[in-house]
Amino acid sequence: MGETPRVIDGPADVHPTAIVHPKAELGAGVRVGPYAVVGKGVRLGDGTEVGPHAVLEGRLEVGPGCRIFAGAVIGYPPQDLKWKDGTPSGVRIGARTVIREYVTIHRSSLEDGWTVIGDECFLMATSHVAHDCRVGNGVILTSYTGLTGFVQVGDRAFISGLTGIHQFVRIGTLAFVSGCSRLPQDVPPYFLVEGNPAEVRGVNIVGLRRAGVPAAARLEIQRAYKLLYRSGHTPAQGLERVRTELGPSPYIDQLVEFIAASRRGIV
């Protein structure tokens, strides 16, 4: 093509077998491995590494310090029958996120829409993030996990392998989803779910401790769990008891707001 990609504020290391479009933008210290493809309009933040045979296409913005491993495919059109070729949409990925081998991330199905992944996430090999998903900061997706369209995942949630998640489902902050689960409904923050279909089994105590949630707040969350799931109430009755008997606290407030906003119901 005779042109070289635009490099912002410093040199990039591009393997001679890689194909980088002249209208891609590479930050300082970016490394692009053998046979990788970086398409038109892709923007890579400082220090990001792209492994061999990875394919990055379309309106794709990758933050600084990310690592994209071999065979990952990011920014391709959504697997949506309503999709029309040429619809302007994209993918945004935050800083210091790790994307392992053969992960697939599709761009939004909506005009000027975005599929969004936050900072410091870890997407393990072969996991999939579909169009229009919103993934928070510090989220871990383990291998063979699939997020379908419009799924939302809260900060520091952990989703174990071979989990299938229905379109439009929301997974709350610091939730833990056990392996081989099926999620047809929303998962409230802080809880541990497992099964096909998934059921709440308890509180994600290990995750709460690792996140530095104070002991008093963990006890409040455990009380909320018992009111919601172990007191024989309907979800609405349990939620009302949580509202009136617990808090106010940032953790209980977030739990109540999440459940109250659910359109699909909660597991």
Q: Locations of the language-model features?
A:
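Terminal amphipathic alpha-helical/low-complexity segments used for targeting or macromolecular assembly
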Residues: 1-17, 22-23, 28-29, 65, ...
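Structural signal for interior beta-strand "rungs" in well-ordered beta-sheet cores
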Residues: 8, 13-199
